[in-house]
Amino acid sequence: MIVLGIDPGYALMGWGVVESEGSRMKLINYGCIETKAGVPMQNRLRTLQLGVKDLLNIYRPDDVAFEELFFARNVTTALMVGAARGAAIIAAAEYTENLYEYTPMQIKQAITGYGKADKKQIQQMVKLLLKMDEIPKPDDAADAIACAITHCQAGVAKTQFLMK
């Protein structure tokens, strides 16, 4: 199974492609789709949407896993990231119905065994689980890889994480 993990973002949208076979996982590729500040919102969203479409066409994932948004304070940031997430979901929905979402706590629990793990712990475990030489950068890409790993580990229970 090939999974595209996405960490929604407006300036940087992290992505990671992980292939799993049984309990074995292999990192295929990762990176970020970047939008430039000062560009009109609709153009930035279009860049994100087209970027996700390109990833889907290149890697042909079986499933797409999104990290759910969690913002406690900044409403403006939440709205912008929500719009970016929407652009990515629309692109993915045109490709497949197999869209899943995981909360940050579920990802932390799956990756480290502790639902309140910090970023460094998650990054270190991503490196370990995928036998990488170094921690993936930037953080957005590492988060997307962690989301893909979480989905791979969900196994038959993954249906409970289908987007509704």
Where are these regions (language model features)?
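Phosphate- and other anionic-substrate recognition elements at nucleic-acid/protein interfaces
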Residues: 1-164
